[in-house]
């Protein structure tokens, strides 16, 4: 699918990389279809969610398990059913990233991960019922902990 974007110009997103949020993303509930744009650097855990219907809307995302090794949560039965998940191997998890001017403050939202069933391309942003994670988990702090 050819998609015109503000950030990447005109790009071709494969059909298998188009995902659908039945309820949208928090704050953007009216936008349902996004394309996953993977980083050209295969070692990078970062990707983009580009709105198909809104050229200027794109979210930087990251595989949270690469950054926070002990990230763990239980997906409610409601979402397992809504996304038709039968096996954990069907799932990709992304955290939305905020990239401020001060890159030392780059953060990811661990409180509301994006869950994608990669088999049927259904997706949902899930707000976790826990105080263990925040919407602003600092990536550089987490990486520094791993170096110690």
Curated annotation (Swiss-Prot):
One of its GO terms (biological process) is regulation of translation. Disulfide bonds: none annotated. Its main location: cytoplasm. Keywords: Bacterial flagellum biogenesis, Chaperone, Cytoplasm, Translation regulation. Pfam families: FliW (PF02623). NCBIfam families: PRK13285.1-1, PRK13285.2-1. PANTHER family: FLAGELLAR ASSEMBLY FACTOR FLIW. This is Flagellar assembly factor FliW. It comes from Ruminiclostridium cellulolyticum (strain ATCC 35319 / DSM 5812 / JCM 6584 / H10) (Clostridium cellulolyticum).
């Amino acid at each position: 699918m050819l998609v015109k974007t503000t950030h990447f110009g005109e790009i071709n997103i494969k059909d298998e990389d188009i995902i659908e949020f039945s309820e949208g993303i928090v704050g953007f509930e009216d936008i349902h279809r996004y394309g996953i744009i993977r980083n050209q650097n295969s070692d990078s855990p970062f990707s983009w969610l580009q709105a198909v219907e809104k050229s200027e809307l794109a979210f930087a995302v990251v595989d949270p398990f690469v950054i926070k090794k002990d990230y763990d949560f239980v997906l409610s039965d409601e979402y397992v059913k809504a996304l038709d998940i039968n096996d954990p191997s069907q799932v990709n998890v992304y955290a939305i990233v905020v990239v401020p001017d001060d890159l030392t403050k780059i953060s990811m939202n661990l409180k509301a991960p994006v869950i994608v069933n990669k088999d049927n391309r259904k997706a949902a942003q899930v707000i976790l019922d826990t105080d263990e994670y925040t919407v602003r988990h600092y990536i550089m702090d987490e990486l520094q902990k791993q170096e110690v």
